[in-house]
Amino acid sequence: MDTHAPYDKPKRTPRLPRRLRPLRLLAAAATAALTLTAGLTTPLNPAPQSAQAAADDGKDVLTVAVAQSVDSLSPFLATRLVSTSIHRLMYEYLTNYDPKDNRAIPGLATKWEPSADKLTWTYTIRDNSKWSDGKQATAEDAAWTFNKMMTDDGAATANGSFVANFREVTAPSPTKLVIELKKPQATMAALDVPIVPKHVWENVGDFSKFNNDRTYPIVGNGPFVVTDYAADSFVRLKANTSFWRGAPKFDELVFRYYKDQDAAVAALRKGEVSFVAGAPALTPAQAASLEGEENIKVNDAPGRRFYALATNPGARAKDGEKFGDGHESLLDQQVRQALFMAVDRKTIIDKVFQGYAVEGEGYVPPRFSTYHWKPTDGQKLSYAPDKASQLLDEAGYKKNADGKRVGKDGKPINYRILCHATDPQDKAVGKYLQEWWGELGIGVTLNCLDNVTDPWLAGEYDLAFDGWSVNPDPDFVLSIHTCAALPATPKDTGATDNFICDKRYDELYGKQLAEYDAAKRADLVKQLQSRLYDTGYMNVMAYPNAVEAYRTDQIESITTMPRDAGNIYGQDGYWSWWSATPAAVGEASEESSSAGVIIGIVAGVVVLAGVGSFFGMRRRASAEDRE
């Protein structure tokens, strides 16, 4: 959970994500931003000194400017990429991803193996991982985490799809975890769930409301420990010197929220921040302005996100009750496909992204070639406004004397599109939609909000700009379109992205989840994308590049993922921030940083018995995005 992306539990607010359906943080927490210490630079109180100099005790501080605020510090609730990225730094997962090629490698588990029938999986839990309060991390912590998700709907909010097929989870010993399945599950080496300390979390009452932001430092066993947090302002972490892979090289890591991304870029120029991620990437203008700047490096890499228009298919809950106010014409597949054909993707790539993106088609970006899908020539809904107009006529939505397309109620059709107020791409594409769909006789109202979550969850929209960070194993971002992801009742928060519930899609989803053969599963995932494309519910317009920048006089070296032409922010792992070397050290090169990552990886051994090439598959790790 982009997703999950989610810009992660791949962007999602619903796009400012990896993952699903955050609960609102207490508004009062935002006032904490006004009481920051003098040594901390914030958008509300910028300081002239560099990010590293901001720590008056001489510590090396890496400050990351982000375009998302944290939705929750609880790994059971968080869906935004910034939140799930922080959770990867706070907690270990059973497995991790190799930063070179995305293959499954040891995390909290040193090895894992299935039974002959693939229904029982045994994980060996490492004995050298400790919680930051000094207690040993054990298999009991993992078993408790999974069991809580299996028995508490609140704890299953973000990542419940991973445990839905679990029959029983036990910890026969401190280093042995056993998971019994109801039926085969191909994601058992890709369980993207943060493992939490039982002795801390067993004291939590309502998991649906607890945001893990009451006591600091927050107990974890990842490379960093959260020491402070102010809503809509910052998250501060310190290096975990007892981390089993070795301590990070930076003493502190700060994620600082900037609503205005031009201000974030300006802060990078001044040296007030070390790194800027963008919203979720730098705009072409921002990237161009930084190219050639002294001590600044722009990283432009193929992205793991898709950028889409999500259609409200008629919001409903599992209990069958309908809610929201989506336009009734969008229930017609022919109308949805007509809207597809009235979107010029080439113009969006050339004019909006200015080449920093690839034209969208399937749900999984081309970066993940195993699962990437393209429609056939006869299937592709190419830009053809005349054909789109014809489809609308055939569907019974014709123009009146004023040239306005009218609905079955005789009123002119006007679609409300949810738009992220902080995302310039949303606004730019929205203007094109007003032009293109206006030629069809359809009105468009852009509803650009700081918080799109509330109307989205309420089903009070017609279409919405959407996007998730997809992971090497795309199961999570596929699961959010199943009927099982719908909320139990209209008052509940489900894992669904945009209320899709399609029987054929569900059948294909179940088949891919149970398929251990890598090639057969990849084919089923492509069939899923084909089905999603044909329904017209998700119009993937682009795959944006990961465009980001950092100061080379503050960061000597940092690991990208994948190693060749990869991103830094929002990785499927903690490699970037864990490996980052302060420029003041001056001895580490990019190669030595990467070597450190390799050394940390080969310390573990993966048992592949009985599964063949399955573990060689690229798997999911975050939205994101989880997002």
Label every PLM stretch briefly:
Residues 63, 138-145, 178-180, 222-223, ...:
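Alpha-helical secondary-structure segments
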Residues 2, 34-36, 230, 304-307, ...:
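Detector for C-terminal structural segments
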Residues 156-159, 168-170, 227-241, 254-322, ...:
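Extracellular/periplasmic solute-recognition and catalytic clefts
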